[in-house]
A protein has these predicted regions:
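OB-fold/S1-family RNA-binding modules
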Residues: 1-142, 147-148, 250-271
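Conserved glycine-centered short motifs in functionally critical loops
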Residues: 9, 15, 36, 136-271
Length: 271
């Protein structure tokens, strides 16, 4: 990457390369560099013409910055319900990622008769993301609990009790849990120390496979994570860089009755 950059950038300039560029071709880097150099020349020209303090350049809108940072071939598309924002993003994608132009879709609320959030069941998904319990495809579940010090995720078989081999049932359930936990960490923006209680497995190779599956699922997470080996008790300790406050903090308040304890003490038993 450094060799390519030395070829495409002028010696008097420096660049910061984002992680998303690790698989970029030399042509793509050259195109992006040319765009940035044109932008810089435009800024310099504006500076020369300015007679006093003036705005020379500003970052694009938040929506465009999110598209720039996050949108890639992994996404099926972007749906926008604001006409001006749709035009802005469609123009941006057309300029810098024209191969993705057909993935930008406009949602006409008036014509559809439903808001974008209603049609895409966004509110429903947010409610699910705030629940402590998450169901797995085979009938097992996750229970996600937050404490002051860390987040605990408990894996349960639930309805998935299997019909023959208990070890295979537990192994299969843990594999599903590994995928879903990685998804929930991103969806809920959970950071800090996280302890995962996978269901106990007797076969060491199964433990290794579950941990590898979990690490592979986490590899799609742009937020830095560190995962430690699974213990004899089936516990996995990990850390995830805390970027924001998390979904729960943004959408919930501490219960004024129990003050966040989740229980009510029966004081009549103490009298």
């Amino acid at each position: 990457m450094r060799t390519i950059l030395d070829r495409v950038k002028p010696a008097e300039h420096g660049v910061i390369v984002r992680t998303a560029a690790e698989n970029a071709t030399e042509h793509e880097l050259q195109t992006d560099m040319s765009r940035l150099l044109d932008l810089w020349e435009d800024i310099k020209e504006r500076s020369k013409k300015a007679n006093g303090p003036t705005l020379l350049y500003r970052e694009p809108s938040l929506a465009v910055r999110v598209i720039r940072e996050e949108f890639n071939s992994d996404y099926r598309g972007i749906i926008i319900d604001d006409p001006e924002l749709f035009d802005e993003i469609h123009q941006y994608i057309g300029d810098f990622n024209p191969e993705f132009s057909d993935r930008i879709e406009f949602h006409d609320t008036q014509a559809e008769g439903l808001s974008l959030f209603e049609k895409q069941h966004v509110h429903e998904q947010i409610h699910k993301a705030l629940d402590t319990k998450v169901w797995l495809p085979s009938g097992g579940s996750l229970v996600i609990e937050h404490t002051e010090a860390l987040t605990v995720i408990d894996v349960n078989t639930g309805k998935n009790i299997g019909k023959t081999n208990l070890e295979e049932t537990v192994f299969s359930n843990n594999l599903e849990a590994a995928d879903e936990i990685a998804r929930q960490l991103r969806l809920r923006d959970i950071g800090g120390i996280i302890v995962i209680d996978f269901i106990d497995m007797d076969i060491r190779e199964n433990r290794r496979k579950v941990l590898e599956r979990f690490k592979d699922a986490l590899s799609r997470d742009k937020t830095r994570t560190q995962v430690f080996e699974i213990s004899e008790l089936g516990l996995v300790e990990m850390t995830r860089k805390r970027i924001g406050e998390g979904l729960l903090t943004n959408f919930a308040d501490t219960c004024p009755t129990c003050e966040g304890r989740g229980i009510m003490v029966d004081h009549s038993m103490l009298d």
